[in-house]
Amino acid sequence: MGMMQEFREFAVKGNVVDLAVGVIIGGAFGKIVDSVVNDLIMPVVGLVFGKLDFSNLFVVLGSVPPGTAMTLDALKKAGVPVFAYGNFITVAVNFIILAFIIFMMVKQINRLRREAPAAPAPAPVTPEDIVLLREIRDSLKR
């Protein structure tokens, strides 16, 4: 079997195709979760805690050159070490929401799998030679 034939068989197997579809849908779903976190949840969290923009929360760890604006971007461009925890808060909330949504989806899928009882396996077909041997045995008993 040639290498191309083996690759074709590998690529069209159900698991590989399912994985590819999952990655594509996961990427799109990640954008939806990012939007939910950034556009819906973080503004509410920011309103509760009095800070609407978490991306500019940071602690300066080094000396700031004179004339440098005290924004995260300006400090990073100036090479000042900063502990930028605001973006981490946003990413952590994003992860928690995504993990919870995936958990709920898996939970529902598992529930649906349990509800659908497996169809009983059909009785195995007795091979023809066994049937013939049984007939011979039964005729000898008479």
Curated annotation (Swiss-Prot):
UniProt-annotated location(s): Cell inner membrane
Chief place of localization: membrane
Keyword Metal-binding (UniProt): no
GO cellular-component term (any): plasma membrane
Transmembrane segments: 10-30, 40-60, 86-106
Membrane-protein topology: Multi-pass membrane protein
Stored Pfam families: MscL (PF01741)
Function: Channel that opens in response to stretch forces in the membrane lipid bilayer. May participate in the regulation of osmotic pressure changes within the cell.
Name of the protein this chain belongs to: Large-conductance mechanosensitive channel
